[in-house]
């Protein structure tokens, strides 16, 4: 049995190294190193790392208990680490193209049910009002057209389960993890919506200009009514099953805005809707 130790600073540093190794943030992507760092972080007392190891090894009830603050009496981190089937986690699912103009595709099982529940659990206590970007004012602000809440995940707040989901996004799109912005978990209560909008702008001189080549949306639950993602220009709507995904290119092949990608999150009429949103930019060199 491993002897657990407590060193918060070292535990946080090891967890940070795990995420860096998984996300190509500096050194080349190295999943073995990522899991090694995660195990060390768990051994040093990181509850988040402990919960991640439990979940990745299939011990999901324990993972949620740890995430909620439960203590683990022994130290099974090495055993959990050795039982993780990384190849299964990273195996990319098939993609189905549903539109060539604009370019839209769907994925049936991008995230497991358990990963969806994990992401919701991590986001729920950290939700805040969503904002829109005002191109004229060059800043983010609250807007009448967007009434939902959101939880951003900058790198210090990410975990290896989220990193694996993003790696699967990279696999099915052919895009780089390094080109991805920080992901956001979106939450819609009854009546909340996001009015028709574009995810990128035509004006490269805008103060907040970000060339978002592709938008990737993952349904984290499906036990609600309404809330479809709607494309009013082409007359299409999508509501994915739990773990399913939709992605579309915001730009034409020449890089200009594809105005057919105007889309909206329709109001939820019953229950609550959870979704992961991932914007991806152009390839990053180096």
Which ranges hold each PLM region?
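Short coil/turn and helix-start
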Residues: 25-29, 43
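Structural signature of tandem alpha-helical TPR/SEL1-like repeats
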Residues: 28-36
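Fe(II)/2-oxoglutarate oxygenase catalytic core
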Residues: 1-5, 19, 36-246, 251-286
């Amino acid at each position: 049995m491993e002897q657990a130790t407590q060193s918060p600073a070292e535990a946080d540093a090891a967890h940070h190294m795990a995420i860096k190794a998984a996300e190509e943030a500096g050194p080349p992507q190295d999943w073995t190193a990522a899991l090694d760092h995660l195990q060390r972080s768990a051994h040093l007392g990181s509850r988040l790392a402990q919960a991640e190891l439990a979940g990745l090894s299939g011990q999901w009830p324990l993972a949620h208990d740890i995430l909620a603050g439960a203590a683990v009496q022994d130290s099974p981190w090495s055993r959990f680490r050795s039982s993780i089937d990384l190849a299964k986690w990273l195996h990319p699912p098939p993609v189905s193209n549903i539109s060539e103009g604009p370019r839209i595709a769907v994925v049936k099982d991008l995230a497991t049910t358990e990963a969806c529940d994990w992401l919701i659990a991590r986001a729920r206590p950290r939700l805040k009002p969503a904002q829109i970007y005002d191109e004229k004012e060059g800043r983010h602000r609250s807007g009448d057209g967007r009434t939902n809440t959101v939880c951003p995940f900058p790198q210090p707040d990410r975990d290896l389960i989220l990193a694996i989901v993003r790696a699967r996004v990279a696999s099915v799109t052919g895009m780089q993890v390094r080109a991805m912005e920080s992901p956001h978990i979106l939450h819609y209560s009854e009546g909340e919506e996001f009015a028709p909008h574009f995810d990128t702008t035509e004006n490269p001189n805008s103060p907040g200009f970000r060339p978002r080549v592709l938008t990737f949306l993952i349904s984290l639950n499906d036990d609600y009514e309404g809330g479809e993602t709607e494309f009013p220009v082409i007359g299409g709507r999508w509501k994915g099953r739990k773990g399913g995904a939709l992605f579309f290119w915001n730009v034409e092949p020449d890089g200009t805005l594809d105005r057919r990608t105007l889309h909206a999150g329709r109001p939820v009429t019953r229950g609550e809707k959870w979704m992961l949103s991932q914007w991806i930019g152009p390839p990053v060199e180096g």
